[in-house]
């Protein structure tokens, strides 16, 4: 969208979303789309093959500050899946829920469309449940392929990291969404590239 078109739209009233199309393309935001969406701080609606795909504006997946229940490992998982076209529910979670007899991941994953798969069958977009300082799986990471994961742990920025022995030992199980298709990782990948080139 040219700056002139943007100004003309603003003169018509409040801009509440940006709508554009990918004729014959993929139903995910491109790298450039994600950079511009984050800059605009607006929902973007993408028309592709006769369907409207609505993307709320979420921060880039890497470089987020950790705040439990607001920007934590579940928020990262939820936002990554949103960019891949799969909506996950948001739910209240108290800090240290795993120390208070709760098992939020195992109690909710199947009900939200995920099923367990063998670790040997891992593919990009699968969700790794890990035990982080706990015997209860209390940490989610997105497997990116090529021995890499995307996650967010306390007191660190969200990041991509090697899936080393340390994380393999902490891994409880691997999960895949019933609506997942391999091409959906494109939505996540495009954000990772956009964030790495964001100036």
Swiss-Prot record:
<dbReference type="GO" id="GO:0006508">
    <property type="term" value="P:proteolysis"/>
</dbReference>
<dbReference type="InterPro" id="IPR000064">
    <property type="entry name" value="NLP_P60_dom"/>
</dbReference>
<dbReference type="GO" id="GO:0098003">
    <property type="term" value="P:viral tail assembly"/>
</dbReference>
<feature type="binding site">
    <location>
        <position position="33"/>
    </location>
    <ligand>
        <name>Zn(2+)</name>
    </ligand>
</feature>
<feature type="active site">
    <location>
        <position position="151"/>
    </location>
</feature>
<dbReference type="GO" id="GO:0008235">
    <property type="term" value="F:metalloexopeptidase activity"/>
</dbReference>
<keyword id="KW-0426">Late protein</keyword>
<comment type="function">
    <text>Plays a role in tail tip complex assembly. The tail tip complex is assembled successively with three tail tip proteins J, one tail tip protein I, one tail tip protein L and one tail tip protein K. The tail tip complex interacts with tail measure protein to initiate tail tube assembly. The formation of the tail tip complex is completed by the addition of tail tip protein M, which is followed by tail tube polymerization. May be excluded form tail tip during maturation and would be absent from virions. May be involved in tail measure protein processing.</text>
</comment>
<keyword id="KW-0479">Metal-binding</keyword>
<keyword id="KW-0482">Metalloprotease</keyword>
<comment type="similarity">
    <text>Belongs to the peptidase C40 family.</text>
</comment>
<feature type="short sequence motif" description="JAMM motif">
    <location>
        <begin position="20"/>
        <end position="33"/>
    </location>
</feature>
<dbReference type="GO" id="GO:0008234">
    <property type="term" value="F:cysteine-type peptidase activity"/>
</dbReference>
<keyword id="KW-1035">Host cytoplasm</keyword>
<feature type="active site" description="Nucleophile">
    <location>
        <position position="73"/>
    </location>
</feature>
<feature type="domain" description="MPN">
    <location>
        <begin position="1"/>
        <end position="77"/>
    </location>
</feature>
<feature type="binding site">
    <location>
        <position position="20"/>
    </location>
    <ligand>
        <name>Zn(2+)</name>
    </ligand>
</feature>
<feature type="domain" description="NlpC/P60">
    <location>
        <begin position="40"/>
        <end position="186"/>
    </location>
</feature>
<keyword id="KW-1188">Viral release from host cell</keyword>
<feature type="active site" description="Proton acceptor">
    <location>
        <position position="139"/>
    </location>
</feature>
<keyword id="KW-1245">Viral tail assembly</keyword>
<dbReference type="Pfam" id="PF00877">
    <property type="entry name" value="NLPC_P60"/>
</dbReference>
<keyword id="KW-0645">Protease</keyword>
<dbReference type="GO" id="GO:0001897">
    <property type="term" value="P:symbiont-mediated cytolysis of host cell"/>
</dbReference>
<keyword id="KW-0862">Zinc</keyword>
<feature type="binding site">
    <location>
        <position position="22"/>
    </location>
    <ligand>
        <name>Zn(2+)</name>
    </ligand>
</feature>
<dbReference type="GO" id="GO:0030430">
    <property type="term" value="C:host cell cytoplasm"/>
</dbReference>
<protein>
    <recommendedName>
        <fullName>Tail tip assembly protein K</fullName>
        <ecNumber>3.4.-.-</ecNumber>
    </recommendedName>
</protein>
<keyword id="KW-0378">Hydrolase</keyword>
<dbReference type="InterPro" id="IPR037518">
    <property type="entry name" value="MPN"/>
</dbReference>
<dbReference type="InterPro" id="IPR051929">
    <property type="entry name" value="VirAsm_ModProt"/>
</dbReference>
<dbReference type="GO" id="GO:0008270">
    <property type="term" value="F:zinc ion binding"/>
</dbReference>
<dbReference type="InterPro" id="IPR038765">
    <property type="entry name" value="Papain-like_cys_pep_sf"/>
</dbReference>
<keyword id="KW-0788">Thiol protease</keyword>
């Amino acid at each position: 969208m040219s700056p002139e078109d943007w100004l003309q739209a603003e003169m018509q009233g409040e801009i509440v979303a940006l709508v554009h199309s990918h004729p014959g393309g993929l139903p995910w935001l491109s790298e450039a789309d994600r950079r511009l969406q984050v800059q605009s701080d607006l929902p973007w609606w993408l028309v592709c093959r006769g369907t409207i795909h609505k993307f709320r504006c979420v921060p880039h997946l890497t470089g987020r500050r950790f705040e439990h229940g607001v920007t934590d490992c579940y928020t990262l998982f939820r936002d990554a899946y949103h960019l891949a076209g799969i909506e996950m529910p948001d739910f209240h979670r108290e800090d240290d829920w795993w120390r208070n007899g709760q098992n939020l991941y195992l109690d909710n994953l199947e009900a939200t469309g995920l099923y367990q798969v063998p670790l040997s069958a891992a593919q990009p977009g699968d969700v790794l449940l890990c035990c982080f300082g706990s015997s209860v799986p209390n940490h989610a990471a997105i497997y990116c392929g090529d021995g890499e994961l995307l996650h967010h742990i306390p007191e660190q920025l969200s990041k991509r990291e090697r899936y080393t022995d340390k994380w393999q030992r902490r891994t409880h199980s691997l999960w895949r969404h019933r609506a997942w298709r391999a091409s959906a990782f494109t939505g996540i990948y495009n954000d990772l590239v956009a964030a790495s080139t964001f100036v």
